[in-house]
């Protein structure tokens, strides 16, 4: 069974999805930023778990969510897909890292 917090129909999940949906093109947010925007500070890890469970056809802009150091948390093909999506939106990665001071949606 899934922890209540990360169940896709939980209040937490709906708040997280709304925060992710609010990230405009060309901007990014960290897992912690999303947790704070959703009203659940200190729940960044649960945000990561929820994002990892999104269905393949999700319309949420999952690629705009990064680690707190501005790096992509995904690996392999998924990391490459995320990098390509960010670059299509003119988000600059230098050394695999996005400057959150410049590109963050919520800071």
Language-model regions, residue ranges each:
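Nucleic acid-binding interface residues in structured DNA/RNA-binding domains
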Residues: 2-107
């Amino acid at each position: 069974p899934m922890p209540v917090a990360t169940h896709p129909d939980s209040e937490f999940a709906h708040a997280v999805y709304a925060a992710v949906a609010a990230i405009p093109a060309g901007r990014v947010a960290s897992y912690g930023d999303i947790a704070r925007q959703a009203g659940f500070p200190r729940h960044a890890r649960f945000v990561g778990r929820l994002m990892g469970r999104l269905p393949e056809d999700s319309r949420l802009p999952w690629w705009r969510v990064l680690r707190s150091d501005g790096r992509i948390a995904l690996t392999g093909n998924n990391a490459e897909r995320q990098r390509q999506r960010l670059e299509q939106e003119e988000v600059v990665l230098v050394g695999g890292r996005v400057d959150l001071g410049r590109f963050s949606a919520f800071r």
